[in-house]
Amino acid sequence: MKEYLSSAADVISAQKTDAEVGLSDAEAASRLEAHGPNKLKEAPKESIIKRFFAQMADPMVIMLLVAAAISAAEGIYTGEGGIADVVIILFVVVINSVLGVVQEGKAEEALAALQEMSAAQSKVIRDGRLETVASTELVVGDIILLEAGDSVPADCRILESASMKVEESALTGESVPVEKHAETLSLAEDTDDIPLGDRKNMCYSGSIVVYGRGRAVVVATGMDTEMGKIADAISQAEEGQTPLQIALDKLSHTLTILVVVISLLVFATGFIKHGAEMLGNFDLILSTFMVAVSLAVAAIPEGLVAVVTIVLAMGVTRMSERHAIVRRLTAVETLGCTQVICSDKTGTLTQNKMTVVRHETENLDAHVRTMALCSDATWDDAEQVAKGEPTEAALVTDAAKLGYTTSDLASSRPRIGEAPFDSSRKMMSVVVRTRSGKVVQHTKGAPDEVLARCTKIMTSDGIIDLTDEARSEILAQNKSMADQALRVMASARRDWGTEAPQSYDPANLEHDMVFVGLSGMIDPVRPEVKGAVAEAHEAGMRTVMITGDHIDTAVAIAVELGIITDRSQAITGAQLDKISDEEFDQRIETIGVYARVQPEHKVRIVDTWRKKGMVTAMTGDGVNDAPSIKRADIGIGMGITGTDVTKGVADMVLADDNFATIISACEEGRRIYDNIRKCIQFLLSSNLAEVISVFIASLVGFTILQPTHLLWINLITDSLPALAMATEKAEPGIMKRKPRNPKDGIFAGGVGFDCLVQGSIIALLTLASYFIGHYFEYGTFDISQVITNPEAGVEGMTMAFLTLSMVEMFHSFNMRSLRGSIFKLTSQNIWLWGSFVMSLILTFVVIETPLSQAFGFAEIGFEEYAMAMLLAASIIPLMELYKAVMRSVQKNKA
C-alpha cells in the first residue's frame, strides 16, 4: 500500500488503529513482539577471536613475540633454558590481549548504556491517553504527535498538520524544509509513483520537524522505513579519539621509535665492545639482543592508553550518576578548562514550574480563555493537573481555576487553524469557531510584540481604540511585573465574522488585533543555583545568562543569582544588533545578561567569546539552539525539555536540566583530568626508571632485569595502582583554581621534569638494591665476577626486581597529589590501598613460589626483604622533599 496515495481514513483502516484513541497497550505490545523494536540493524560485531588477534598488531607485542621466538630458538639450540622465558612472554602477551578485548567490551557496554540514557522519546496516543515512550518502542499503527524540534521517529502518514515543516536532507539531500499537509496525493500524468521529496503528506524517519506541529500514524518502523532500506549506505560517524588520546598515541609511537634507535645503539655498542668475538657467538648475540628487548619493554608504558581510556570511561559513568550524560569523550577533557558558561534561564537557572500570580486586564474571563485556547498544554480532569510546556501549563491551570478546562474549550470552541509560535515573532495564534458560528482568532505572546500589532483594546465598557496613553500604561504594567522577576505574557484577539481566514500565515493574522490583557508568572530560581554561580566564579568560570525573556525579568533574576550587579551589564538582542563586531569584542566581558535574543545572537555571542580564546559552554533546548550549541566548545542539551535535535548535537546532556549540574560536571572534568595526569606521571616515571636502570647496567656490562621481569612490573605492579588512581577524589581547592589552558600538553606544568627527576631517583634506588643484593650474597660490592659470569648476578637481579616493584607501589601514593603533601590529604583511597596489597602479594608469589624458577630468581631472606622495603619506602620522604622544593620555587616565581 502506498500510503501517500491513500486517504488518511483508508490508512487508519489498513493499520487497524483509531485516529483519536490509538492502539491499546496490549495491541502495541503484541505488535512490538511480532515485528521487533523500531531501530536499524546494527553492523555485525567482530568476533572475540578476531579482536583477540587484533591486539597483537601493536609494535610492542610484535617485538615481544620476536623475543619469544629467539628464546625458543635458544632453548632448541642449547637444549636448556629459554623455554621458561618463552612461556612467560607468551603468557603476558595473551593476558594483554585478553585485557584489551575485555576493555573494548566494557567500553561498548558503557557506550550502549549512555545511548540508552539519551535515547529519543516520542509522544504517542494509546488507549486514548497521551504517553511518552522510547522511540524504539513505536509500532505500526501508533498515533504520534510531532512538533518543532522533534526528530521523526518512524515513517508515518500525516493525519493533521498545523503549518508543519519538515527538513528531510538526511533522505533527499535538500536542506530547505518541506511544508506538510494531510491531503491525499495523486499521480501526475505518465508517472507511476511520486518522488520521496514530493510526498507532502508523509514524514520519514530521520527527518526533523523545524516548524509547526502535527499528528500522524506510523506506517513503517525499523528496517522497513525508507531510512532502513538504504541503511547500508548510511555510515554512522564513530566516536573520535580525544586530544589526550591522540597525544598519548603520538607519545607511544615516539617512544617506540626512540626504543628502536636505543636498542640498535645497544646492539651496535655490543659489536664494537666485543668485536669479532661476537660474530658466530650465538650466546653473545642473544644476550645483547635481550638487553635491547629489555630496553624496549622498559621504555614503552604498555598499559598507558588502556588505563587512560578506562579512567575516561569511569569518569563518564560517574558523571552520568550526577545527571550529566556525556555523549562525546572530548567533552570530559574540555569541561576541565571551561571559562565561560552561557546558560539559558528558564528551567536551567529556574525551576521551570510557572505559576500565574498577577493579571492586568479589564475582562478576566476573556483574557484567561484566550490564554488557554492559545495553548497546546492540556488539563487532566482526573488528576487535576496541567500537562505540557511549563508556561502554557501555568496558563491552562489558571483558566481551569475559573472553570475553563481545555476539554470544555475544545468542544465549545474547536480549533480550525493556527500560526504556531516561533522565536522571531515571539507569539502564536489560533483560530476557533464558536458554537454560534463566529470565527475568532486568539493570540498570546511577548507583551511588546503583541502590543505592537494591536490597534484596539478590550475594556469593561467594550472594545475601544488603543491610544498612546493606553499603550504607555500597558508597557508600565509590563515593566512593573518584569521588575518583580515575573514572566509576562500578553493576550489579544481578532474577530473574523463567520468566514475563516483564507490563509493562516502570521502576516495575514497578526495585525489590527484587540489587546485583552497581561498575565504575570513566576518561575522560582532553583535554590542550588546561586551557590553554583558563586562556585563557578571562584573557579574562574564566568556565567552569562541568555534568554528570550524581557530584560527587566532577566536582570531581576540575574542580580538575585549574583550573575550581574546592575542593569548596566545587560543588553537586549535589538541592542546587540546595533553593536559592531569590533565594539562587541571590546564590550563582551562587561555583559552578563542578554535578553530578548534570537538564535543568531547566541551564535554571535559564542563566536565572540571563542575568538577571545575563551573555552565556552552553551546550553539550549530548542531546535533553534542547535547552531550555537554546535559552535560552542561544550554544547549542553537539556534532557527534560530539550528537543531531539538539540540533544543530538550536544556534547553533554543534563538529565535534570539544572545549572548546578554543569558546575558539578566541570568539577568532575577537572578531577578526571588531574587523575589522568597522575596516571601518566606515575607510569612514565616508572618506565623511565626502568630504562635508566637497564641502560646503565648494559653500559657497565651486567644484566639488572630481564624482559619478563619488566613485563611483569609494567602490566601487573604498575597497572593496578594506575587504575586505582582513577577513583582518586578531587584534591582540596580544585574549584578554587583557574581553568587550565586547553593548549597545555601532557607535560605542561612541569610533568616532564617531574618524570625525569622521579625516574632518576627510582633508578638509583633500583641500582643500589642490585649492589646490596650482591653484597648480601658475596659480602662485596665488587660485581666484576658478574660481568664474566652472569649466573653470579641472580641475587642482585632478584633484589632489583623486588625493590623496583615495591618502590613503584609506594610511589603510587606520592601520585595522590602532584604538588601537595600526601599527608595533608583528608580522604583515603581504599582502591589504591587494595592495589598496593594485591601487587605486594603477587610480587611475593613470583619470588617465593616455583614461579621464581621460571623468572630466574634466587632465594632471599628476611634481611633482603627488609632492606628492599626500606629502600622502597624511602621514595615517599624523598618525593615529599622534592614537592616542597618545587612549591617553594613556584611561590618565588609568583
Where do the PLM segments sit?
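Conserved cytosolic headpiece of P-type ATPases
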Residues: M1-P739, D744-F747, S760, F801, ...
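Short N-terminal signal/transit or membrane-insertion segments
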Residues: L146-A148, G773, S805
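Membrane-helix interface motif
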Residues: I272-E277, L767-D782, E848-S852
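Core segments of transmembrane alpha-helices
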Residues: A689-E690, D754-T766
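Helix-coil boundary and interhelical linker segments in multi-pass alpha-helical membrane proteins
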Residues: S698-Q706, I772-E795
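Generic alpha-helical transmembrane segments
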Residues: T717, E795-S812
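Membrane-water interface at loop-to-transmembrane-helix junctions
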Residues: P742-S760, N789-M799
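A C-terminal functional module that forms or caps the active site or interfaces directly
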Residues: M815
